[in-house]
Swiss-Prot record:
Disulfide bonds: none annotated. PANTHER family: CATALASE, CATALASE B. Belongs to the catalase family. GO terms for molecular function: catalase activity; heme binding; metal ion binding. Its cofactor is heme. It comes from Penicillium janthinellum (Penicillium vitale). Residues 189-208 have a biased composition (Polar residues). Its EC number is 1.11.1.6. Residues 187-211 are annotated as: Disordered. This is Catalase. One of its GO terms (biological process) is response to oxidative stress. InterPro entries: Catalase (IPR018028), Catalase_AS (IPR024708), Catalase_clade2 (IPR024712), Catalase_core (IPR011614), Catalase_haem_BS (IPR002226), Catalase_sf (IPR020835). Heme binds at residue 353.
Length: 696
């Protein structure tokens, strides 16, 4: 091969030498006392080689050990200085070099990267001020939301192989992980998503990674926003499929990594767009939706996604050890314009990430090749230690010195030094204690929304995946029953489907939760009754089919529960409307939607939809599509995103880049209105329209 010829050419130019540079010639034997004598201890070449070999392996990562990587470039779509002072987002068209590490979470270094698992996606931006890391996974929620639980769940215990005989090789023991997840209600949302197509992506560049830990963006004038990151693959998400997902761990240990390598070499790799959800710290949504609670995802319709830029992969890694094993990503790597939040998982990981990296590579990990910031000089007070590689000047290793002069570091609220000021946590409203804070004990709503509102055709696929996961991999009968019962908690129909697929007794509906019967859609509740009724300023409608009287009865029950609160004045009695000669029941919860365009068919199913405030509706318009003979999740309609600049409503369409998240074309005015809006992104809107079109 070309690389082999290059290696031989390189070796032919040089004689074998020792680490200190002394050439020894082309000899490959040890020194002996005679032709058949004992090896001599004075053979320092042998000792140097063997000592280095014995120390080649560094401690394996406790999680994310199996990985690969790629280099690329990030392009900022525009100037985002209204949200952050970070320089890589400071100008339209600004390019920033980056590197990304892809991984599985549970498997060992040599395990199959096709195993059903959470998949890591860590990106490092080499920005002007230093290195900025976005560390996340391909699933928007997490198992736990307090870091003290993490070692038991993640590191070496529940998600690892059976400790008795370490099987399955490098993968999870199904009984151990099932036992843990079914005992924890807050793990339900992520557990259900791992069991779906999201647990077995076919290509790393076609996953939908998320930085599920929230963080802060800070502007030059000190304005703060609480944010979360999302990556969106422009080629769409691609999974292995149910059968391949269970066959590949046996046949293709490096399939996903090889797929990434070849796609970059052939220039067919997909790009990823960076999207964020942002809200100010005085936004009342922070009280309704605990954005620091990573077991639940934020509501896109209430906190719209803003597309900030695009990540392009353009170069493969050259050495796995240097660029993947030796690359130290951590959430503590932030730059000016980015800061931390009170997220308990984040706070614990700020300590844990650095601790485990120091354990693996020593105290000078920042001096290793791809950990060094290429655009920013290093002026810290670190000295000596194993692995010291930088020639430091003979300066005093402390700030206050008469010889070199002491600088007056001002504590300012704005400008370059604003991140040093004492009031950086002035938004903190809670006392310090040892109790676990949460504003939302509802652990089933997000799992229900994921399972009952998938893309068309995915629900059967997910049930089939559950069948394989709960039967083929050797899960005990008790474990199968426990999983079936847990799925019944978030949806009675889902529990029955899973139970039937795996051949266990169908669970009874849990009376503590509202169970849809003939509904299809996403239900997200902030915090409320056991029926999942949202509180606060939520607007939405509940639609139920009279073909299923139970759905009308449940809707009425939901309405009664909701109307008993302080906002009962917003609720009106159930109505019957005739649409397309099929009567549907409509129970409005704050009737702000204009139903003039509503055109429903026999198979329309929808549980609860939340939209933004009335101003959002007036600003962007909201027309419903033709859903005749279609099962469509209206939550996929989405809205427009803007840069939310403080300009007039009319100017927002002209200045802010708009983008349609999801839409359905069909015979409706929604897409027509979208395409008529002033926008420099009209081609992208049309592509999305074609992709999500409803076929007659």
């Amino acid at each position: 091969t070309a690389s082999g010829k290059l290696q031989r050419k390189f070796l032919d130019r040089f004689a074998i030498s020792m680490g200190r540079g002394v050439a020894l010639g082309k000899t490959y034997g040890t020194l002996g006392a005679a032709s058949r004598g004992a090896t001599l201890l004075q053979d320092l070449l042998f000792t140097e080689i063997i000592f280095a070999f014995d120390r080649e392996r560094v401690p394996e990562r406790a999680v994310h050990a199996r990985g690969t990587g790629a280099h690329g470039t990030f392009l900022s779509y525009e100037d985002w200085s209204n949200l952050t002072a970070a320089s890589f987002l400071s100008a339209e068209g600004k390019f920033t070099p980056e590197m990304t590490r892809f991984s599985t979470v549970s498997g060992a270094r040599g395990s199959a990267d096709t195993a059903r698992d959470v998949h890591g996606f860590a990106t490092r931006f080499y920005v002007d001020e230093g290195n900025f890391d976005i560390v996340g996974n391909n699933i928007p929620v997490f198992f736990i939301w307090d870091v003290i639980i993490e070692p038991t769940l993640m590191a070496l215990h529940a998600q690892k192989p059976n400790p008795r005989f370490h099987l399955p090789r490098g993968q999870q023991d199904p009984n151990r992980i099932s036992d843990n997840l079914t005992a924890r209600g807050d793990s339900l949302a992520q557990g259900s998503q791992i069991s779906s197509e999201r647990g077995s992506p076919k290509a790393y560049s076609n996953t939908e990674p998320n930085k599920h830990r929230s963080f802060r963006l800070v502007t030059d004038n000190g304005k703060q926003f609480q944010c979360s990151n999302h990556w969106q693959p422009l080629q769409g998400f691609i999974d292995l499929g149910v059968e391949e997902a269970w066959r590949f761990p046996e046949e293709g240990e490096g399939y996903v990594a090889e797929n990434l390598f070849e796609s970059i070499e052939l220039l067919t790799v997909g790009d990823e767009e960076l999207e964020i959800q942002s809200m100010s710290f005085n936004n009342d949504l922070r009280e309704r939706f605990n954005s620091s609670e990573v077991t639940k995802s934020s509501v896109v319709r209430l906190v719209p996604l803003i597309t900030q830029g695009k990540l392009v992969f353009n170069k493969n890694i050259q050495m796995l050890f240097n660029e993947v094993i030796g690359a130290m990503f951590q959430p503590g790597h932030i730059v000016r314009g980015v800061d931390f939040t009170e997220d308990p998982l984040l706070q614990g990981r700020l300590f844990s990430y650095l601790d485990t990296q120091l354990n693996r590579h020593g105290p000078n990990i920042q001096q290793l090749g791809f950990n060094r910031p290429p655009r920013a000089p290093i002026h810290n007070n670190n000295r000596d230690g194993a692995g010291e590689m930088i020639d430091l000047p003979p300066f005093a290793s402390f700030v206050e010195t008469q010889e070199w002069g002491a600088k007056d570091i001002k504590q300012t609220a704005v400008g370059q030094n604003k991140f040093d000021q004492e009031h950086r946590f002035s938004h903190w409203k809670f006392g310090v204690n040892g109790f676990v804070h949460t504003r939302n004990d509802d652990n089933v709503t997000h799992a229900r929304g994921f399972f009952t509102a998938p893309e068309r055709g995915q629900q059967k696929k997910r049930v089939a995946a559950f069948d394989r996961m709960f039967t083929v991999v050797g899960l005990s009968v008790d474990g199968q029953q426990a999983n079936s019962d847990q799925y019944a908690d978030f949806d009675a129909a889902a529990g029955k489907k899973v139970a039937k697929a795996i051949g266990v007794e169908a669970p009874k509906p849990n009376s503590n939760y509202f169970h849809p019967t003939d509904v299809f859609g996403e239900h997200i509740a902030a915090s409320g009754t056991k029926y999942g009724v949202p509180e606060g300023n939520t607007k939405g409608v509940l639609l139920a089919s009279v073909n299923k009287p139970a759905s009308i009865a449940q809707g009425a029950k939901l309405q009664v529960v909701a109307s008993s609160g302080d906002f009962a004045e917003f609720f009106i009695s159930a109505k019957q409307l005739n649409m397309r000669e099929v009567t549907q029941g409509i129970i409005p919860l704050v009737p702000v939607l204009k139903l003039a365009k509503l055109d429903l068919g026999k198979t329309f199913r929808f549980q609860l939809m939340q939209v933004g405030n009335i101003e959002e509706l007036e600003r962007f318009g909201f027309d419903l599509p033709d859903l005749t003979d279609k099962q469509v999740d209206l939550s996929a309609m989405g809205m427009f995103e803007t840069t939310f600049r403080p300009t007039s409503r009319a100017a927002q369409f002209e200045q802010g880049k708009t983008k349609l998240v999801k839409g359905l074309q069909g015979k409706n005015a929604f897409m027509d209105r979208a395409l008529k809006q002033p926008s420099n992104n009209r081609e992208k809107i049309q592509r999305f329209a074609d992709r999500f079109a409803v076929q007659d």
